[in-house]
Regions:
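N-terminal signal peptide c-region/cleavage motif recognized by signal peptidases
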Residues: 21-26
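Low-complexity, intrinsically disordered short peptide segments enriched in small/polar/basic residues
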Residues: 2-3, 17, 96
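Gram-negative bacterial Sec-dependent N-terminal signal peptides
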Residues: 12-20
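Compact, glycine-rich, soluble single-domain proteins
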Residues: 27-156
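Bacterial N-terminal signal peptides that target proteins for export
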Residues: 2-13
């Protein structure tokens, strides 16, 4: 009986360790190979990776040590809703623009690395664009500014 229990325990422990290893694999390295989209705001161009699945959105820009100035990540949700973001496992400071279906920026939040405080949209939005911290203010882009790109045209 004791031997049977030990065998069951070892099997359960092995299964648990395998499950932990498989589920944590996605956070061992940053996401670098996501589909991309070109966005603009006036003369400013953005090369944004698209985080469109729940897994891609959950990982986001975690574990990145740097990001080129013209690049970012746009989070695409199925429906407009109040969106809140944390900086868990995110190593670089970011600015997040919360964007309505038509590409208008609702609000922008500045976010510190590794902080667990929530940064939320002021109203329901479908899109959130993360860029290096201060990128929007340096370009004169603020709440009410409009972004152009195929994602926003598709919503018309």
């Amino acid at each position: 009986m004791k031997q049977k229990f030990m065998r069951y325990f070892q099997y359960s422990l092995s299964s648990l360790l395998l499950l932990v290893a498989l589920t944590s694999h996605g956070q061992d390295a940053p996401q670098l190979n996501l589909e991309r989209v070109k966005l603009t705001s006036g003369m400013h161009r953005i090369d944004a990776q698209i985080a469109g699945t729940p897994e891609q959105r959950q990982t986001g820009l975690m574990l990145r040590k740097e990001m080129p100035q013209h690049e970012g990540m746009i989070f695409v949700f199925d429906q407009p809703a109040k969106q809140c973001f944390l900086m868990k496992n995110t190593l670089i400071p970011l600015s997040a623009a919360f964007i309505s279906d038509d590409g208008v920026i609702v609000n922008i939040e500045e976010m510190k690395p590794l902080a667990l405080d929530a940064h939320c949209s002021a109203q329901p939005v479908r899109y959130v664009l993360e860029m290096n911290k201060g990128w929007f203010s340096k370009k004169g882009i603020k709440a009410g500014s409009k972004l152009q790109g195929p994602l926003f045209q598709a919503q018309k």
